[in-house]
Amino acid sequence: MQITDVRHHLTTELGSPALFVVIETDAGVTGYGEATIHFFPQAVAGLLDDLRPYLIGEDPRRIEHLWQMCFRTLFMRGGPVTGAAISGVDMALWDIKGKSLGVPVYELLGGLARTKVRLYGHVSGDTAEQMAENARERVSRGITAIRFRGFHVYDREEVHDHQMAVDQQVEFTAAIREAVGPDVDILIECHG
């Protein structure tokens, strides 16, 4: 089996960019992966284009070999763009291997650990009202846990006001809780 094509598809249908990797083989098996980062998705797409000639003609079942080849081929070996691109390729290769063996990928990774996974809905907005409305919309679709990025008040022209960020966090959390009620879990992402 050999890789015959590596493509990507960028969509913003859900409001945020999502970049998908498609790897095709001469055996008719197609693998799909996700290479999404929310900033600079075109940079990831460009890196996937750069990796394409190195992957075509290779055996997609040699996942570790191809991961190492992709990593070592790149001049810039670290960071989110490289990580996203290689991750998308890696997922697509695992998808191909699972399909070619007739087993789900989780069987290749050690077997079934649970029968279901709880999802959360991410919400965003610049105001408490926007956050609350977005949270209500997610709950109306059956989501039982809401996640949002906390402490993100900043003005690129000003020094970060930590107290303003804490005050906004309290305001956003209260607005979301009021919008979704007591039975929906709230998760606060505290990165970056």
Model-inferred region functions:
Residues 1-32, 36:
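Structured beta-strand/loop patches that form or line metal/cofactor-binding pockets in enzymes
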Residues 7, 36, 92, 149, ...:
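Anionic group-transfer/hydrolysis microenvironments
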Residues 9-12, 81, 85, 140:
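Short Gly/Pro-enriched turn/cap motifs at secondary-structure boundaries
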Residues 26-101:
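Metal- or metallocofactor-binding catalytic centers and their adjacent structured scaffolds
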Residues 47, 62, 66, 85, ...:
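General structural feature for long, well-ordered alpha-helical segments within catalytic domains
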Residues 90-126, 130:
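Glycine-rich, aromatic-flanked loop segments that form ligand/cofactor-binding clefts
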Residues 116-192:
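Metal-dependent enolase-superfamily TIM-barrel catalytic cores that perform enediolate-based chemistry
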